[in-house]
Amino acid sequence: MNKYPIDDIKAPAYLFIGGEVLFMKENIKVQKVSTRLDVPTSHNIKAGDILTDQAITIKGSPVAFSNSNVLFDALAFVKGQRLPKIDNCYIVARVASGKWVKWSFAPAIHDTIGSITFGANLPMGEHGWTVYPNPLKPNEPLVKVEETTAPVVSNLEDAGKFMLRVLGKYGDELAFDTDGANIDISISTEDAQNDRLIKYGKTLSDITVSAKFKPRNISLDDWELLTGITSAEEIGTFTGVNTCEDLVLQGAKKGDFMFTLKSARCKDPSDTFSPKDALMDELTFDAMGDNFGDNKLVIGTVAEDFQFADESAQ
């Protein structure tokens, strides 16, 4: 490959995960991270160090994708499950006119799912993948580099679908509008290590899902019912993980994305009595999941155009 002044290289790139293509906002960040243990002599002088673990992280905020499943696959995993390694992960980048390079990674683990924001210019937060060495083949590189040709990119779906009008439903009775919403997703993991303490993967500890929004086009009575702020609750009462209503946030048109927070409960609701501010503050709902505390967020598509009950009656 020809040499170029490193400062002059600008490298627009595509990320392929499991063969599916992702186009990231602004950049794709690849970082090699290592942990080393100092080895001192008897005089407490550092003689060197030992490499104890190493990994490569890949991070970026998707703006377009060929298949949304590659972004939300981890939502279906259950606690205690080993996060699967995904083959066929690589970056194809243009480093000069007509010059493309391909970085092929060892199998990667999807361990970070970014937030989903409706009604903003940044619809999706940062996703992350981690590449670990294979303990059975410790000499294999984590990434291989080669020259290649321009990638063949299929039709991409714009993440702007998440920027559409967001409607909400809670249970079977309550339907309301919003002025935008945000869904935060956090994955907690534990390192998987062999008997020589070499990290080779991750085990899922838990997934937490919460949604924030301000309801609109809702009556005061329905808002009080939605938040539970005026409901009487007895101290010491047990509430099972799958006993609350489901919260649905969805687009208004058929085919739009629909996000279902399983057994969602309003967390610390508040209101503001003021001559200047709206009574209805932003609400936060936490998903508790199914009977085992799993499957907290289910993603689908809207089957038909949404209509409020009073609209359909007109």
Spans of features found by a protein language model:
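Charged, amphipathic alpha-helical segments
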Residues: M1, S61-R82, P138-A150, R216-T237
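Solvent-exposed edge beta-strands and adjacent loop segments
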Residues: M1-V70, V101-E126, V152-W223, S263-D281
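Protruding loop/beta-arch "assembly-hinge" segments enriched in small, turn-prone residues
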Residues: T130-S154, L279-Q314
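Residues on the solvent-exposed faces and adjacent turns
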Residues: K32, V95, P133, I185-I187, ...
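Short, acidic/charged, Gly/Pro-enriched secondary-structure junctions
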Residues: F72-K102, I229-F257
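Short, tandemly repeated low-complexity microdomains enriched for cysteine and small residues
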Residues: I28, L71-A76, K102-A108, E140-E147, ...
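Short Gly/Pro-enriched loop/turn and capping motifs at secondary-structure junctions
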Residues: G98, K254-D256, C266-D268, D290-F292
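Short, loop-centered acidic/histidine patches that primarily coordinate divalent metals
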Residues: A106, Y132, A252, K262-A264, ...
